[in-house]
Amino acid sequence: MQAVPSENLAIDRKKRAKEPFLELDLRPAEERVCDFHEVVIGFTPEQAKIEAARCIHCPDPAPCMLGCPTHNDIPSAMWLIEQGKFSEAAKIYHKTSSLPEVCGRVCPHEQLCEGACVLNKNGEPVITGQLEVFALEQERAKEPYVPKIAPSTGKKVAIVGAGPAGLGCGDELLKLGHEVTFYDSKPAPGGLLVYGIPNFKISKDVFFERWNDMVKLGAKFVGNTYIGRDKSIDDILTEGFDAMFVG
């Protein structure tokens, strides 16, 4: 369900549908061949508002929401960005995604939300992925997101694998008040985000900023531990854990 009901917006949808989309600014090729920094420069606040204003706000549920695996309330986020309410837009993504700053960069948007955008019929879709990144970066620059945490339950959960699946599960468990410990064979958390996807797609700093948020909520990490070889599942369960998630 949309936080900002589309039917309540007095907008000229025909005019919006004809607005040209903004080409993403990329770092010059002569710079990119010398390093592995992110390729996309991203939107300025003014560019973000212009691009978000291309959204025609389809009836709920909008095609972009249905095309998103986490069903992000994209139309509401677009409206808030258009109004310059960037932090409020970021909070929309936090409601349905544990790693929105990551998904905004690495999701195949052209096959998901952007691929489902009705503007594809006569032109280019709203560039929802980079607008998600923009909103999250604006929020972090001003006031990092701090979720509401339930009172401690006294329950302990072991997460095997500190990749995207484990991190998403752990994030939800932490917010529910459980104690969470991640186990991973690598020396640092992140899984594919750190050891698979190159920096020019997503900077490692992006992930570790998000990881630090989880540490502040109480997340613990045990690295260089291969579950099934260095330590068995039974070993973990005998250490006082009430449940286990295998990512």
Give the location of each predicted region.
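Residue-level detector of alpha-helix initiation sites
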Residues: 98, 163-164, 188
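Ferredoxin-type iron-sulfur electron-transfer modules and their immediate structural context
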Residues: 1-156, 204, 237, 241, ...
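Glycine-rich FAD pyrophosphate-binding loop
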Residues: 178-194
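N-terminal Rossmann-like FAD-binding beta1-loop-alpha1 element of flavoenzymes
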Residues: 155-181
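N-terminal glycine-rich dinucleotide-binding loop that anchors FAD/FMN and/or NAD(P) in oxidoreductases
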Residues: 126, 196-223
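A conserved short coil-to-beta-strand element within the FAD-binding core of flavoproteins
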Residues: 222-239
